[in-house]
Every structure is written in C-alpha cells, then in structure tokens.
Design a protein with these regions (language model features):
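N-terminal periplasmic accessory domains that precede
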Residues: 76-83, 128-131, 156, 194-197, ...
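Gram-negative outer-membrane beta-barrel transporters
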Residues: 539, 734-877
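C-terminal beta-signal and adjacent terminal beta-strands/loops
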Residues: 178, 739, 810-813, 868-876, ...
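Surface-exposed extracellular loop regions of Gram-negative outer-membrane beta-barrel proteins
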Residues: 232-249, 254, 365, 371-379, ...
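Outer-membrane beta-barrel transmembrane domain signature of Gram-negative proteins
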Residues: 447, 451-466, 470-471, 483, ...
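Extracytoplasmic beta-strand/coil segments of soluble accessory domains associated
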Residues: 48-50, 129-179
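Short acidic/polar hinge/loop motifs at secondary-structure boundaries
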Residues: 47-50, 173-211
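Short, acidic, small-residue-rich periplasmic hinge/interaction motif at the N-terminus
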Residues: 18-23, 28-33, 57-65, 73-121
Length: 956
C-alpha cells in the first residue's frame, strides 16, 4: 500500500564548504531543509548527499559560522562559502520530538549531539562506553574488576541513575538489553544494562543523548533519558583506522612500572550506492585485542599453614597425601589403615618441625598444625608473595563487530525500505580471588600452591531491524520490526571443584543465559503547517516480546559432593567432603559455580503500547510538546504516562525551556527470574550466596514482597543562550527525578542454622546465604547540567573549537526502607537494604563531572586537549568507619594529528597524560594488599597513563 508512482529520479549533490579564505571547513552540517536527511563535511570540507528530487534547499550550519540556505537546482559541483558568525549548532535531531524540523537548540528538553567520527579521529577512546564517559559528563561507565560477568560488560549510567533506567535506540528503534544481570560488588548492582560495546564506533554517524525522562514517548526504561545511535550512511568512501596503544604507568605490572594492557583496534567502513534513487548499504566493523593489566602489588596475608608444610615433606617422599584427607572424611578410627596413616602424618609433621610426640589423635594434630607457616614455606618452596597475586584490573578481550545499514527508496515521495543489522562476538578472560593453599576451597593434591581461577566468557550479540515507510495521503507511515538477542556463556578455567577431590576436572562448562527481544512498531505522523504556527501530530502502537533463558552447565560445575563421590543433599547424617581440618569443601567450580537444572528456565512476556505525541508551535516564540503513552505488560499490568514540555523564545539569542513527565520501568525478566549461586567476597571473606527468584519459597519465608514496576516523575527547567559578540552558545538545565519502589539487590540473609526450611533451601542451592531483588526504597535525583560551546577562527588557517560541559548531581534515598512486617519483626531491615547498597546508589559514581575540550586545527595539524574533572566517590561497605571518600581528580587527554597525505592522517596521543590515579584505599579496605584502589567505587579506572598511535586512511 506504500507504493506510489515514481517521480523524478533522486540526485546526488556534491560540493565543498569553505571559509572566506577558501580553506575547506570540516564537520559542517549539510541538511535538506525540512527533513532529517543530512551529512557532515569531511576533513577537506567536502560533502556528498543524496536528495529525492531537485530543486532542493540545503541548510549549511555550524557553531561560529553564519547559517546559509542554498537553493540547488542541478547536480553541478557546489562551492559554498560560509562567513564567520554567531549562529549556534542547529542539528536536526531524531529523539525528544517527532517534529521533523526540530533542532537541538529549539528542543524543549536537553539533547547532546556527539560527533563520533570527529572524536574517533582524535580522542584516545575507541569503544562507545569510553567515548561517552569522557565526552558527556552526565554519562558514567568504567571497566570493573573481580566482579564475575561484570568484568566483561561495563555498566553505564546517565545522571547517576541505574544502567536499566537508560533506554538505547538505534536509528530511533529500541535496542535490546544485555543478558547479564549485575549481582557482584559494583555500581549498577541488581540491574541490567545495554551492551554498548557490541556496536562498533565506525558504524556510528552521531549520538543523540536526551537528558530527560521519556517513558511517555518511548516506553519502559527511559526514566533517566535516551541514547539514540544514528548509523553511518556514507557511500563510495573507504575508511580504515588502526589504533594501537598500551598503559605506560608507574603502577603498571603490579606497581613495578613499565608497559601493560596492550590494545589494538582495527576498524573499517565502506558504503555502496544502490540503484539510481539514492539507495545505499553501508558496512562497518572492527576487530580488537585487549590484554589485561594488574594493579595488585603484593598479597600481605597468610598463605600456608602447618598442614601445607607436612604436605611438602610428604610429596618429597612421593607419599599420596590424599590419604591424610581420608582421616577427616569417614575412615574408621578403629581400622588399621587409620592408625597407619595417622602415624605417617605424625612422622612428616615431626620432619617439618612440629612436635607431635604427645598427640594421641587427629583433633590434637589439627590443633598443632593450625598455625601460620607462610614465611618458612615461601622460603622452602622458592616462592614470593607476588606469586599469589590476583589480576586486579581490566580483563582480556578478543572481539569483532559488524554492522550494516541499508536504505532503498522506492519512489520520490518518501517510500523506502530500510534495514540495519549487527553481529558481534567477544571472548573475555578475567580472574577471581586467588585460592590459597591454606583454604578449604583449594584441593592441594591437585594445586600444591593454590591457583588463580579464570572466568572465560563468550558474549554474542545479533540484531536485525527491517521497516518500510512512506505516505498514505498526507500522513507519514513507518512500519518496522526489530529483533535482538544477547547471549553470555561461561567457561571456567584453571579451577577445581574442591568437594570432588581427585576426580575434579580443571575446566568447567558453567552454562550461561540469553535474552531475546522482538519489537514491532507502527508509527504515523503529520505536520500541519496551517494549524497555529505549525502542529506535529504523531501516534502509533508497539508490540514487544521478550524471552529470558538460563542454561545449565555440567554437573561438576554446580554440585557439592560427599566423600564417596555422590552429590551432597543435606539429608541428616550426610556431609560434604572435608579438608584436613574438618571444614566442608564448597562445591561447584571455584570462582563461578555453574548453573544447575534447578536454575534452568525459559521465561517470556509480552507488552503492547499505544501513544499520542503532539508538538505545537503556537507562535514564533512559543511551542509545546504533549505526549501520552499507555502500556500493558502480560506479567504485571498496565501503566499510563504523560509528558509536557515547552520552550519560549525570549529573543533571537535566548530561549527558556521546561518539562514535566511521569515514567515507569517494568522489572526486567532477569530481575523477576534470575537465580544462581555465586561466590561473593565480603571484606575479603568468600561467601557462597544464592540468588533466589522473587516468588521463590525462600522469598516467602523471609517476607520479601513481590516485585512491581518502578514509577517516576521528573521536572526539568533551563535555558539556551547565544552570545553573538563572542561566538558562544550556552545551555543550562536543572532537573529533579523522583523514583518510587526502586528495584535493588538485597543484602545476604543467612539461615538460622537450626535445620529450618530456609536452611534446607540454602543447602539445596549449595549456598550459605540468600539474596533477592526487591522494591526496597524510593530515591530522588537532582542536579544541574551546563554546556558552553565556543568556536573561533585564529588567523587565516587556524580554527579553535572549545566545549565546556559539566554536571552536578545528587541521588539519595527518600524516606525509610520498605520492609515487610516479617523483616521488621526479625530485625532484618538493614540486611534488606544494607549500607553497601545505599552507597552503590548514592555515592559510587562521581556526583560532579566537568569536561573541557579544545580542538585546534591549523594547516595539516590538529591538536586535541581535554581535561575531565571527576568528583568524589565513596567506598561501598557496610562498615561505616571504613566508608572512605576518594578525592576529586583531573584526567588530561592530549593528541596531535598530522595529515601526511591526501588520504592519510597520523595521530599520536595519550589518555591520562599525567598518570593520575584515584586516592589509595585505607588499610581497612585493602583486603590484605589485594586492592590498593577501590574496586567497588570507580571514578575513572586504575589503568593510569595510556599512550596510543593511530593511522587513518580515507579513500574516495
């Protein structure tokens, strides 16, 4: 029904934008007036744009230059001269309004436009999370360490809110989230984010960051804002970029200095025109290799005990030390074998320097040998304390990504088929806590000196969106379907199931999980030019289907065994395998116990939504947007939200804007259904924690309320201003976001140890404590965002662009903890929402962040200088006395680019040029030397100085 008679064939318009001296101007915006069809000039000032028909009006604009409107009536090559001026950036944006003529500066809500091509040409960062972290102050994301799967997918935040309160779009279509839910000790604990690093930066034309609630326009998750990724549309242009670098830091290589964390990224992009009507397909992709780095200096705690010394002497005599362990695992004390082994043990203990002459039995030997023997054993074994270090820092990564963006116009009236698709695969490798030989979780006959277990991840991501849009009468119609899937699989290496004894493998398939989302949209919009001063009307419907799965691993990855090799069930009279001291050996693969059949699940849900969006311009000075959206979920019910936003043009150079909206976020399928057992370290002490579903029997026993949606209301107000005499533009926006029934990950509930039903459930889960997802608190977030932009010519060949962006924010708990009567009566309210969880929400990311970026282009050279001010963060711990505050820091990036040839640019530079580190942790938070810098509250990471070199080819 979208097919209309063909008109004139589309045309490609090419040209060059120059300043008054004839010098080409890069990064100028070239837009077909009244549409969102646009491009930017390259580093020579040249552009190419496909238009549906001629004649057409092109709008040429950029900060610091006067905007020009050029009427193009033929396809001859254009040379367009732009005069210096005071016009601000008027980039037409996709998000925040469905008015096709709305620009960022005329938007009633704050929108940041991030030119990814410009940044990746000069800035050190190449992945999307880090690009945004250093360019958008309201956005925060850092690599994590010793946090299981979160080492491999970086959590991200907008305005200090959770990773699951930011909606991500690609070309205006909803992007699926990750399959990983963060349950370890990091910011974003208990939430599910979007894996932005699965999208290659070479595939991105620009980013649009909407810093305002938008659930009434886009649905669930848009409480903090929206990030829209606009894909690359370039054709007949091959872009190839190779970036390589490493950390050259005083704290590299376990704080001895040197080079580590080597990284190489190779990206490419090429587009082909299709047909004669402006169609195209663009392919973009990259491949990267990232090595790990380690910032742990030296383990300072105990390593060996007296029994380990006995083992060393026994091993030297080729004695089977597993016989010693049989003494604590059911061997009959009256048997001949028992007494023989006991006497052998005494003999080796005496040889090791322990006097066992007066000891009569095993318990006395256990007491005698239960002493620290670290110093003597290190010397005897020729080892150093550094041999027992962990890998505290970034994980290893090998990854590749491929994206395609396609459009095929079918006529000259806007009918077109479009599609975009992505594939990515990443293999990650990180390590956990070192398993020391003195611990019960180390089976020393297999690992005499302990071991460093590794988490190997395989993360795959696929997406495909297909749509058709055109006109029915005077209405623009867009029908689309977007599919996405993310899967995360665990392979645990260099590890052991200590409860399995000699039968344990050292590599385990621990299972994994996947998340799939399919979204179908029908959108209609029309612009009424003669209603008021213009009225945009949009309405539409959406259907979304989601599926979440947990896949079990092999039996040994999740099972705790008895001494006879059968699974331990917790039945009275049975016990798991014990170590020499009689301590139970934990089951499952060390560092990450696998998912078992009891965890396995396949859950789906659907939602339907309908929306209406009105954008009215009442006069040349005042316009208003009103949006409302109804949404119904199959698993928790319906919600109705609205948004009202207005902008008033007080003068040509000053605008005032404000908005109010309500919002919601449905609990994710992950939060509703995730269940597993994992090893969580609390103050350096390992605890097997079972995560139980919110509707589980354990949740009911403890009085954990059923999960429901988060609801929000938010208000923002601000202004945009231009200072014509100084070529400066300013935006300032204040905001307040109130969220009720915020979903958190609780603390650890321990069983009473009386054989209760909760105790039995914990044993069945191979856990000693239980955690849940719950609507525990209300929060309020408030702050101010400031953006100042200046662009100027310095002489004939030099241009300086400066951007100052800052955010000042605060998130805090409002009111009391929403605990049930059962929790109140049991005195477990502080476990339900502990201090650690409060700090993760309020103080674990910088509340203040300021970014000052300067880019100077002169002749063949480009100089990039950026300083980022990171505000204070606090250590997330339940011990109030140890809640250390880490002071503010400034990180400096610097690069120098040189255009060596027409199609070749060379760039060298540094991230964190001055090798700045966060404050060191106080002694109580160092965990015996494991963490000299906080692993729970990251300001900007602990990599230190990163030096890079880049070669960029651009062939047309």
């Amino acid at each position: 029904m979208f097919m209309l008679p063909l008109g004139l064939m589309a045309q490609t318009v090419k040209g060059k934008v120059t300043d008054s001296s004839g010098e080409g101007l890069p990064f100028m915006n070239v837009i077909v007036k009244g549409t969102s069809n646009g491009t930017t000039t390259d580093d020579k000032g040249e552009f190419s744009i496909t238009v549906k028909k001629l004649p057409v009006n092109l709008v040429i604009s950029s900060i610091g230059f006067k905007t020009r409107v050029i009427n193009v009536s033929n396809s001859s090559y254009l040379t367009i001269t732009i005069q210096d001026g005071n016009e601000s950036l008027e980039e037409i944006v996709v998000i925040g309004s469905r008015n096709p003529n709305r620009t960022a500066i005329d938007s009633p809500v704050p929108i940041d436009i991030v030119d990814v091509k410009e940044l990746t040409a000069m800035a050190p960062q190449v992945n999307l999370n880090q690009i945004l972290n250093f360019v958008a102050p309201s956005f925060t994301s850092n690599t994590q360490t010793i946090s299981d799967g979160t080492d491999h997918i970086d959590p991200a935040s907008l305005r200090g809110l959770g990773p699951d309160q930011v909606l991500v779009l690609i070309n205006g279509k909803r992007r699926h989230t990750s399959s990983l839910i963060n349950v370890n000790g990091t910011f974003g604990r208990g939430s599910v984010g979007t894996d932005l690093n699965s999208i290659p930066s070479s595939a991105i034309k620009r980013l649009e960051v909407l810093r305002d609630g938008a659930a009434a326009q886009y649905g669930s998750d848009a409480i903090a804002g929206v990030i829209n990724i606009v894909l690359n549309e370039s054709v007949n242009e091959l872009s190839l970029v190779v970036t390589s670098g490493a950390h050259f830091s005083k704290n590299s290589n376990s704080q001895t200095g040197g080079v580590d964390g080597e990284t190489t990224n190779i990206s490419a992009s090429y587009g082909l025109p299709i047909g004669e009507n402006g169609g195209f397909i663009n392919f973009s992709g990259d491949f990267d290799v990232r090595e790990d780095y380690n910032r742990m200096k030296e383990w300072e705690g105990g390593i060996f005990n007296g029994y380990n010394a006995v083992e060393r002497f026994a091993n030297a005599a080729n004695y089977d030390t597993t016989q010693f362990l049989s003494l604590a695992n059911g061997l009959d004390p009256a048997s001949t074998d028992y007494n023989t082994i006991l006497n052998d043990l005494k003999g080796f203990a005496n040889a090791a320097g322990y006097n066992t002459t007066a000891s009569d039995g095993l318990s006395e030997l256990q007491t005698i040998l239960n002493v620290d023997a670290t110093t003597s054993e290190l010397a005897a074994r020729g080892l150093e304390r550094t041999d027992f270090n962990m890998r505290v820092g970034q994980s290893k990564v090998r990854g590749s990504r491929l994206f395609a963006n396609f459009k095929l116009p079918l006529d000259n009236n806007g009918t077109e088929i479009y599609s975009f698709a992505g594939l990515s695969s990443r293999a990650g490798n990180s390590a956990g806590f070192y398993r020391l030989p003195s611990q019960s979780r180390t089976f020393t006959p297999a690992y005499i000196n302990g071991f460093l277990p590794e988490i190997n991840s395989t993360i795959s991501d696929q997406s495909l969106a297909v749509g058709i849009k055109g006109k029915i009468g005077d209405w623009n119609v867009d029908f689309s379907n977007a599919y996405g899937k993310n899967a995360f699989d665990y392979m645990i290496g260099n590890t052991y199931n200590a409860s399995q004894g000699v039968a344990s493998p050292t590599v385990f398939d621990a299972g994994g999980f996947s998340f799939t989302q399919n979204t179908t949209n029908l959108d209609l919009n029309r612009f009424f030019e003669n209603t008021f001063e213009g009225l945009g009307v949009a309405f539409g419907a959406e259907h979304r289907l989601e599926n979440y799965q947990i896949i079990s691993g092999e039996e040994a990855s999740y099972t705790q065994y008895q001494a006879d090799g059968t699974p331990f069930t917790g039945i009275a009279g049975t016990s798991p395998l014990k170590d020499f001291y009689g301590r139970s050996r934990p089951g499952g693969s060390q560092v990450f116990p696998g998912f078992g059949p009891q965890n396995e699940l396949d859950r789906s849900r659907s939602s339907v939504a309908a929306y209406v969006d009105l954008d009215a311009t009442f006069s040349e000075t005042f316009s208003t947007t009103l949006a409302t959206r109804y949404e119904n979920y199959s698993d928790f019910g319906s919600t109705l939200n609205f948004k009202l936003a207005s902008i008033y043009k007080a003068s040509d150079n000053f605008r005032i804007r404000a908005s109010f909206n309500t919002g919601f976020r449905a609990p994710s399928l992950h939060q509703l259904n995730f269940n597993s057992t994992s090893t969580i370290f609390e103050d350096g002490v390992p605890v097997e924690v079972g995560t139980f579903a919110n509707d589980s029997k354990a949740a009911k026993l403890l009085g954990i309320p059923q999960l429901k949606e988060e609801t929000s209301n938010s208000f923002s107000a601000g202004f945009t201003a231009k200072l014509p005499e100084s070529n400066i533009s300013i935006t300032l926006d204040g905001y307040m976001v109130n969220i009720d029934d915020r979903v958190v990950y609780t603390g650890q509930f321990k069983g009473p140890g009386t054989g209760s039903e909760l105790d039995r459930l914990l044993v069945q889960a191979n856990a000693s404590a239980a955690s849940f997802f719950a609507n525990a608190i209300d929060t309020q977030s408030k702050g101010v965002d400031l953006v100042i932009t200046h662009k100027a010519n310095l002489g004939e060949n030099a241009r300086l662009k400066s951007d100052l962006a800052a955010t000042f924010s605060k998130t805090e708990q409002v009111g009391g903890i929403k605990a049930s009567d059962v929790l109140e009566a049991a005195g477990l309210v502080d476990t339900y929402f502990p201090e650690t969880s409060r700090i993760f929400l309020e103080e674990s990311v910088p509340r203040t962040k300021v970014n000052l970026t300067n880019s100077l282009t002169t002749g063949k050279f480009n100089i990039f200088l950026r300083n980022v001010y990171f505000g204070e963060v606090s250590e997330a711990t339940n011990t109030v006395a140890n809640q250390q505050t880490f002071a503010t820091k400034i990180v400096t990036d610097l690069s120098l680019g040189y255009k060596a040839a027409e199609n070749l640019t060379l760039t060298v530079g540094a991230n964190n040029l001055l090798d700045v580190f966060p404050d060191r942790a106080i002694e109580a938070n160092r965990s015996g030397g494991r963490f000299d810098w906080s692993r729970r509250s990251q300001q900007f990471g602990v990599g230190g100085r990163f030096l890079f070199a880049r070669v960029s080819f651009n062939l047309k």
